[in-house]
Amino acid sequence: MKKLIILLSVALYACSSSDENPNPIQVDEDNNPPVSQSFTSFLTGKSTDLVTSPDGGVCLMGGSTENDQAMKWFLERANGGDVLVLRATGGDGYNSYFFSELGVTLNSVETIVVKNAEASTEDYIHQKIKNAEAIWFAGGDQWDYISYWRNTPIATLINDAISNRNIVIGGTSAGMAIQGGYYFSAKNGTVTSSTALNNPYDTDVTVESDDFIKNEFLSNVITDTHYDNPDRKGRQVTFMARVLKDSGVQIKGIACDENTAICIDDNGIASVYGQYPDYDDNAYFIQVNPELITVEPENCAPNTPLTWNLDGNAISVYHIKGTEDGNATFDLNDWTTGTGGTWENWYVDNGALID
């Protein structure tokens, strides 16, 4: 009888413990997050959440090596809070870089590597997004991010964090490519400028605008990255021509070279960071020439080279060299006011971009 009472007591205790917290989210004694088949997580810093008031903004980075000054700008806007790194490949390379190498005090840096679309339902990831003051998207393949997260709770929570908690957000390479309201999805793989310019309707020219990441100053923008390796001016101009031809919408373009970053504050002022004049680091703010009445491409059709000439004035571009101090700026409120850059006209003639 005594053994029976003990067994019943143990069973009742186990049941009551489970009922109180059926899905506990916690780290183990070594500060490691739970193991999951759909994601892997790496935590540096404190496992307890620290609530701060982030300053908002967006950091767009063109790929290759990160620009330290732009990364400091990004991290400082978390105001000592928690930074979440989301990626579909790779490991914890950002953790120590963010947490201890840039001189910015943070509560934690956690990298979550998602392995499949099933991760979008994971409560652990949901909670980490809710706790983050900053979210950074690593490079990789943007189609992974789009196919895993678009129209899922993860996208909803990220957008809620942007609009309601004013978190700072950003990404490099593929992580930059998904930040605009329009985006090259790479659903069928990448596409070169030559291919796009010579056939704007090639199956690899996959421009989409279904709701994904909603950044206030990028709702009518398509971004592009690695602009100098290889040259991607032609394909981005083709993306813009396609949208104009197919839907009548005059979208704008933002792009930067590798090792270059564009930091947009919550007032819509974009600052460009790079290492010019030591290196030729460039950023571009591209729009249909606002002074023209007729703006559509002369020839944008399947299996035909693009012509978007309009007497050499089709596209208006504000070109900035990125510097360590990020002093050159462009105003995304009016797409007219800039400091430290130069205006250029680009156009396309029979599949050849002239810039």
Where are each of the predicted segments found?
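ATP/NTP phosphate-donor binding region
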Residues: E66-Q127
